[in-house]
Amino acid sequence: MKKMDLVSITMSLVIGLIAFFVSNNIFVCIGVTLIYVLYYFVLARKIIKTYNLKTIKIKSCLYFINTFLITLSIKDSLEDAFEHASNNTDKEFQQLIYEMQEMNVNEKLDYLKKYYSYSSYRMFTKVISLYLDQGGNVLKISESLLNEVVRIDETMNESESSSKKKLVEFVILWLLTFLVLLFMRFALSEFYFSMLKSIPFFALLIVFFLLCLVSLHIFLKRFTKLPVNEEGELNG
């Protein structure tokens, strides 16, 4: 989160600097900067961190299920399947792998239920139990599960791509708004400063920066809304 912290603080300082230019008031500059910085560290940072952790966890689960089943169908070995499926970058998952060193594969799969509390993982463990009891082609047994895993993964990727496009649109919209305000401040300075002496106009400037923060919060909540619920199932 260090990179995100730096970006957010820089953005807060830039917005605070804009507030100084358009209000010609150092106290407004300091106030706006502090409000934006506090918002990030009190609310936004937690929202972003939760979103990132949830995204990593569900994608880690989907990768594990898909890789395990495909490897099992090729090598017909639970140990090899687990080893290949465990090669992901989820740090919390890797910590669990360390804790499960003395367990056999079946015990490991059962232990992971505590971490992967998703319906797809519970279905996965049932598929493995059925395969061990009855044998057969594991890919045929798990066909519907694999299709669902692919569908969830594709939906999450599409949602992430769509959110990034909306983020670009959001940034451009507010950037243009700030540029218009700065244009009035510097290109029409005489007219602008005469308006700035008006208390209602000065108050509107402060409201403007507060509205910007509110719109940022609303966008952030929408941006970090995952297309899956707590069970790992697609919404709707």
Can you name each region flagged by the protein language model?
Residues 54, 58, 118-121, 139:
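Short, structured helix-loop boundary elements
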Residues 44-49, 90, 101-110, 114-123, ...:
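Inter-domain helical "communication" segments and dimerization helices
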Residues 98-99, 125, 129, 158-162, ...:
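Flexible domain-boundary/linker segments
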Residues 64-85, 121-159, 166, 223-224:
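Hydrophobic alpha-helical segments characteristic of transmembrane helices
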Residues 2-26, 166-236:
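Alpha-helical transmembrane anchor segments
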Residues 25-31, 118-121:
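Membrane-interface starts of transmembrane alpha-helices
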Residues 28-111, 126, 226-236:
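Juxtamembrane/interface alpha-helical elements of multi-pass membrane proteins
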Residues 3, 63-64, 123, 195:
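Short alpha-helical interface patches
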